[in-house]
């Protein structure tokens, strides 16, 4: 059910019928008017309006609209580009205020990413869900590199001192980066301890 | 600031028209009261308060720009 053809007394009425059937707001569809309808020849016969209403990519559209609204409400000077893969929709945020939107250790970016996924997942029933990822000024890539370097450095220290090291609390994604960085390490192993949001990675000798 | 909370809340709930936001301005802090339809409470709080926490984090970032302390209360 990606497109519907509906008729009505007016174009507006026909569009509204389609929106009701789709169950989405007006900004989630594109409308093509097939027949304006109205009064026919000499106003004797009134013709029905006919419209074709096509559902947009609702996951992407709802995420895009939500992001724009939040950026406007925060009065930030930020634009974004969209990169799509089979499983993800990635928004790359740019502009002079991105630092503010990243926040301390990315906590603001993670919060916004979480909210945008909650908002977009309302439309899960319409198409296969694709996870939404937010990045800003290459933050995610840089953070991954920093964490990988940190993991290697700490693994060396664990080998030297023969004592386990407990890292600071991290998000699931950041912990995953640490685990991955050391998964093939010959002498140390990693595991997590504690409850969210204070769950931490431990690096220990094997 | 209230505008931001309103924007986020409206996008989360099923009854956006029932969303009400009230700002109480103090000397150094602002209290933002968020009210939604009773059946939408879960939508703005989330499992273990995760959604409410994310809203507060975003508001905190916006408040940084205005150098004020902001408290978001869901009532």
UniProtKB/Swiss-Prot annotation, chain B:
Highest rank taxon of the organism: Bacteria
A biological process term (GO) from this entry: peptidoglycan biosynthetic process
SUPFAM superfamilies named in the record: Prokaryotic type KH domain (KH-domain type II)
InterPro entries, alphabetized: KH_dom-like_a/b, KH_sf_prok-type, KhpA
Keywords: Cell shape, Cell wall biogenesis/degradation, Chaperone, Cytoplasm, RNA-binding
Molecular-function annotations in GO: RNA binding
Pfam families: KH_KhpA-B
Localization terms from the record: Cytoplasm
Function: A probable RNA chaperone. Forms a complex with KhpB which binds to cellular RNA and controls its expression. Plays a role in peptidoglycan (PG) homeostasis and cell length regulation.
HAMAP family reported in the protein's UniProt record: KhpA (MF_00088)
Family listed: Belongs to the KhpA RNA-binding protein family.
Protein name: RNA-binding protein KhpA
Species assigned in the record: Caldanaerobacter subterraneus subsp. tengcongensis (strain DSM 15242 / JCM 11007 / NBRC 100824 / MB4) (Thermoanaerobacter tengcongensis)
Phylogenetic lineage: Bacteria, Bacillati, Bacillota, Clostridia, Thermoanaerobacterales
